[in-house]
């Protein structure tokens, strides 16, 4: 399978629209008609078209996939009237119960809600996508365009016989999602290697350690999102396999994707261990630097104790202190104080406590 850059994957093959086109994700024209992104199969390839709802009844387009990116109310209402499927108002929910996110209606309509990863440099996030499989057509609803969707559109256009029906579209999306997660994990490993080279060198100051901690925390967050993403994909595939909606070839493909996800699980666990090691090492270097500062103050305070004692002794107001009456008494006290400071420093230096 040829590899493609995720960030440069084209949005898709846009055939000439039947009427005035709008944005890439659909919209409405001045007359109020909606533009939809529909995908049809032609000679074993998947092609994307922007079709106006006002004339779709007169076209011969038989979509296999209808992709709704940030759909308007008019688009949802038209989809419901034209295809008899209800598009959910809110696709983002926090219910982790499988029965709430993966279920089948009495009429055979399948509903699946999955998370897909977006990693664009400094930030990463999971985007919820609602899938509805109705009458041989896959409907997908999401708030923004996804790298996984772009990759599938690119591959399905270039590779013949990659997709045969709507269920293949859904499986290929999950397959591309697993591959995208694997590529992102490789990027995390490369980033951690760079951090490791910086942290494990001989001298690490507090500034470098702080930058390393920031980078490690960012990679830990991304690794956690990937772990959650592949877990969600596994649950969706498991539901599809249990629902007996797949033929033998599709079932085997789903099992292969599950095996790929299992390998990603072990890799994320390895990266978590590496992140914890680098985190502990970085915090350890920060503690060492702080201990060096504390050691300097400790040595200085110990070295200044003897001259303080000498000054205290000669500051006592006793009559019988012969040195006070001698002309050399004051220089003698100063020299004694300097010697009492120098002697501990020389001793500490020989012991290696000043390093």
State what each model feature region is:
Residues 148, 253, 327-331:
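Short acidic-hydrophobic sequence patches enriched in Asp/Glu that either
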Residues 236-251, 278-289:
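Long amphipathic alpha-helical coiled-coil segments
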Residues 59-60, 168, 210, 217, ...:
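General secondary-structure edge motif
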Residues 2-242, 246-248, 256, 260-263, ...:
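Peripheral, non-transmembrane regulatory/ligand-interaction domains of membrane transport proteins
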